[in-house]
């Protein structure tokens, strides 16, 4: 079993806290952090080295760029970083664009916590 260090990038504090609480009972999660200021992203990646970044698509409250563009920037600077798109907008174009830029998956925000853990564990296994 892999212990997973997760970073959530989302502009909704209530969702971030809810996901943190929902995942807190799972032994697979070593750390769960969230940021709502994208200017902290580079420093966080360098200092904490998250295993997986869960990236919302719609970040209009914290960034002029959407999550796909931020994911693309992250992956160009940190090609080994695992990024998973997490969004309530389950559109095929987001899934295909995510694959094109190298994200490890797309997860709808309506997912059950145990299913999310299963997906993240599979991503960690390669």
Question: Positions of the model-derived regions?
Answer:
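Conserved phosphoryl-transfer motifs of two-component systems
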Residues: 104-106, 122
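Two-component/phosphorelay signaling modules centered on CheY-like receiver
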Residues: 13-33
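C-terminal output helix
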Residues: 93, 111-121
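As written
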Residues: 98-104
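Active-site beta3 strand of CheY-like receiver
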Residues: 48-54, 59
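Acidic di-acidic motifs
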Residues: 10-11, 90
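Short amphipathic alpha-helix used as the core "switch/output" element in two-component signaling
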Residues: 65-79
């Amino acid at each position: 079993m892999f212990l997973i260090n997760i970073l959530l990038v989302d502009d909704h504090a209530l969702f971030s806290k809810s996901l943190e609480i929902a995942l807190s009972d799972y032994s697979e999660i070593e750390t769960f952090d969230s940021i709502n200021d994208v200017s902290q992203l580079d420093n966080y990646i360098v200092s904490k080295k998250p295993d997986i970044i869960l990236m919302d698509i719609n970040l209009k409250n914290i960034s002029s760029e959407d999550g796909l563009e931020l994911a693309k920037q992250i992956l160009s600077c940190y090609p080994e970083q695992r990024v998973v798109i997490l969004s309530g907008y389950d559109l095929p174009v987001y899934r295909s664009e995510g694959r094109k830029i190298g994200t490890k998956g797309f997860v709808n925000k309506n997912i059950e916590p145990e299913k999310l853990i299963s997906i993240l564990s599979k991503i960690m296994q390669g």
